[in-house]
Amino acid sequence: SLITGITGQDGSYLTEWLLARGHVVHGLVRRSSQISRSRIDHLTRDDSIYNQRLFLHYADLDDVTTIRRLLVKLAPQEIYHLAGQSHVGLSFEIPESTCEFTAMGTLRLLEIVRDLDMPPKFLHVGSSELFGC
């Protein structure tokens, strides 16, 4: 399984859930992420999990070459796309960046998946904030 947004609240819970069920989990982490990875620190400090069943890969959603190379190499059966702008106030301060990351990043990821020989199942998780609620 591949998870984007693995360092977020939902991504960290999903990681724990998948690992508890015996899955190998690969997480995509933004290179420029300023967000704390504290939600998965307990997993990355566990030598029986980290780099055994949990692997982190650093790439931004606008880095099509790296993501394509990673997906071809890993050939995941499932992709859980949870990455997105999670700070509502910030999304209003930087609307173009938010759109680029959230909408265009998702589009790029879907285009790569569509071109794979064995496209994985794809779950895209959004937020009610998308609708201004």
What kind of region is each of these model predictions?
Residues 1-133:
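N-terminal Rossmann-like NAD(P)+-binding domain of SDR-like oxidoreductases, especially those catalyzing
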